[in-house]
Amino acid sequence: MSAIGDKNQFRIIVGSYEHNILCLSLDIPNQKENDAAKTPHFMPIFHFQAHSLSIKCLAVSRRYLVSGSNDEHIRIYDLQKRKELGTLLSHQGSITALQFSHPASSSEDAAVSKGSKNSKWLLSASEDHKIMVWRVKDWETVGTLKGHTARVNDVDIHPTNRIAISVSDDHSIRLWNLMTLRNAAVLKLRKYNTNGTCVRWLGAKGDYFAVGLRDRVLIYETGSAKVFKEIVFQRKTLMHIETHILPFDNKEYLSVGISDGNVHFYPCEELFEKVEENEKQEDDDDKEDISPAFSLLGHTNRIKDFKFYTNEFGTYLVTIGSDGKIVVWDMSTKEQVAVYDCGERLNCLTLCDESIEKYNTMKKRDAETADIGDQSEVESDTEELKKIMFGEKKKLNKKKRKQLKKSKVSVELE
């Protein structure tokens, strides 16, 4: 991810219960500038009603923006041209999650993604118990991942793009082989009375994954497929989880959004530490809450979604809440950078580069083209105007022409 020139800019796209999509460009001034110019500036890019019901999820891959809604539709937009490309209609239930595959970043990934810098697949989850796999090149359906018997709440793709993981209201976690589009494994949540609401892979190689329940986070080891660590929240509801490498210590953190407006940060290194068998038995008898390394409070009520953005200027956390506010944090200082009140009930969020939009591909008209184009048909054709006003002149034959010449009278003055 990169900024434009010397400007620290990126775009924030949010979806709301009011069926709208709002895109804002955030300009964060550099510290070298004078005090008057140090105030961050939000500039609206577009704001429109995208669906007939509330928007549940958003995802971005380079130039493409996709949105999922309770109206069972997935809409595709080209951010470079600010144009809607179409609608995906295969689901028969509300869209609950959208996830693009990872762009190829190594030789191993390039073999999977065929060297393309853009995402190859889009995964969409729905209340119809299905996960659809779409080919981004032509937006055709590659296949359907079937196996869940209830609403699919979330889905995430492994860093290798070969495996996906999903959680559902059927009280299970499923692993999918994206090479064969078949179910690879099923994990049951037998010891817990709540369903998984969100899931994320952990570690650079995806050796672990985190499953968020209503009141706790379960840390699984991928190899053994067993829970070896739990983060419990007393009298609080988990809303969302993400993972990212933070700049102040260059380590990966698991971030957890809570219903009280807080985002808690847990170092993944500590979560990955093995627990001895005797200690594990004691923990089962008397569990102690794992305390976060630090927390950020930016909302008065529950957090709905949050994402991280990294460019040459630093790493930023963007959170949205039911209070309608967008809060931006600088993770190097752990301080708020900017706040924007949308006046709507926000539900989902995604981020993209400011350079995503190519102005030369947009439909623009210069002054001369605009002047010509704005003229009416009558104004642009003077000959047609004369015909309408005075009638069309009839062509004269040779005899009539001679008669006109003879009838002409010449007058000379003495």
UniProtKB/Swiss-Prot annotation:
Gene Ontology BP annotations: maturation of 5.8S rRNA from tricistronic rRNA transcript (SSU-rRNA, 5.8S rRNA, LSU-rRNA); maturation of LSU-rRNA from tricistronic rRNA transcript (SSU-rRNA, 5.8S rRNA, LSU-rRNA); ribosomal large subunit assembly; ribosomal large subunit biogenesis
Modified residues (Phosphothreonine): T382
Residue spans of the WD repeats: 50-78, 90-135, 147-177, 189-221, 238-267, 298-330
A single MF term (Gene Ontology): protein kinase inhibitor activity
Chain positions with Phosphoserine modification: S376, S380
Disulfide bonds listed in the record: none
SMART domains assigned: WD40
Entry GO CC: membrane; nuclear membrane; nucleolus
UniProt modified residues of type N-acetylserine: S2
Main location: nucleus
Keywords assigned by UniProt, alphabetized: Acetylation, Membrane, Nucleus, Phosphoprotein, Repeat, Ribosome biogenesis, WD repeat
Domain of life: Eukaryota
Compartments it resides in: Nucleus, Nucleolus; Nucleus membrane
Membrane topology, from the record: Peripheral membrane protein
Functional note: Essential for cell growth. Plays a role in assembly of 60S pre-ribosomal particles in the nucleolus. Also required for replication of the M1 double-stranded RNA of the L-A virus. This latter function may reflect an enhanced requirement for free 60S ribosomal particles for the translation of viral mRNAs which lack poly-A tails.
Quaternary data: Associates with 60S pre-ribosomal particles.
Miscellaneous information on this protein: Present with 3730 molecules/cell in log phase SD medium.
Protein name (Swiss-Prot/TrEMBL): Protein MAK11
Species per Swiss-Prot/TrEMBL record: Saccharomyces cerevisiae (strain ATCC 204508 / S288c) (Baker's yeast)
Taxonomic lineage from the root: Eukaryota, Fungi, Dikarya, Ascomycota, Saccharomycotina
Gene label: MAK11
